[in-house]
Amino acid sequence: MRQWTSCGYQFNTSTERFGELRSSNDILKDGQALSERMKDDGYLFLRGVLDNDLVLEARHELLLKMAVNNQIDDDYLINEGIDPSLKTEVDQTSYREGRAVRQLAHQGEMTEFYETFFGKQVQAFDFIWVRIVGVGVSTGCHYDWVYMGRGSKSLHTSWTPLGDVSKVEGALAILHGSHKFSGLISTYGSIDVDDERTNQKYGGWYTQNPVEVQEKFGGRWLTTDFEMGDLVVFSMHTMHCSLDNNSPNNRIRLSLDTRYQPAGDETDERWVGESPIAHGAEAKRG
C-alpha cells in the first residue's frame, strides 16, 4: 500500500490502522438510523448527495476571486486551480460571503440532510470556513470542539470538497472511534482555544502526527478518494486531520467547513451574527 502522510508524518497503513470510509447512503432518509450510526462511528460519509451544479458554482466563484488576488497560477485555466509559486495571503471575508458559497452551505440538500438528521429545524453557523490548501500543506489532528464548544452539544461539522479530492490531493481523514476516547475528551477535548484558563497546554491541534494519537488511544484512520457532490458529517469530538496535498499537477484543494445544530439550541457567539467575532480579541476569556 502507498504511504500517506499528514504534516509530513507517515500513517500506519496496516489494515488494522488505516482504511476506507463507510458510506451511509443506504440510510440517507432515515433520521434515526443516521443518528445511531453517528453514535457508533462518529461520522457519516455520503456519496454524491449534493447538487453538482451548486458545488461547481461555489468552486468557480472562489477561483475567480482567487485569480484576482493572485492565488492561482495564471499560466493555466482558472478552473484548474493550480498553485502559484509565489504565495499570497488574503483576507477571506469576501470568499465566505459569496452568494454561491452561502447557497451551497445554507440551502438545498445540505439543510434537508440536517433536518432529517436532527428531526427538527436547523440553524447553521453564519461563519463559513473556506479551506484553500496548497501543495505541501495539511491540517493536523484535532477535535472541532476546542474551537467552537460554547454552545449546542449537538453541533456537527460538514466537510464539503469543492470538486474531486483524491488522497494524494489532501483528502480528509477521520479517526474511527475517537468520539469515544473519554480520556482524551476530558483533557484536550474539553479546552477552549480562546480561554486562558483551559488552554495552557495544547493549542488548537492535538498533534501533527496521526500515529501518536493511535498509539495512545487506538482507533483506525479512514479516508477515501472524494468526488464532487460528496459530504462528510462528523461530531465535535471526532478526531480528524487531512492528508498532505501532494498533487502531481500542483492543484490546490478547495473545500468548505460548515457547522449545524438544532434551531433553538444555545449558540457559540463567536460564529453567528452578521459579523461573527471569530477568534478575535472579543472572544478571549480568562
Annotate each language-model stretch with its function.
Residues 120-123, 150, 162-171, 177-179:
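Active-site region of the double-stranded beta-helix
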Residues 148-167, 228, 233, 259-263:
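Short, conserved beta-strand element in jelly-roll/cupin
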Residues 129, 143-145, 160-164, 176:
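Short, structured patches in soluble enzyme cores that scaffold and shape functional sites
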Residues 1-24, 72, 184-193, 222, ...:
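Non-heme Fe(II)/2-oxoglutarate
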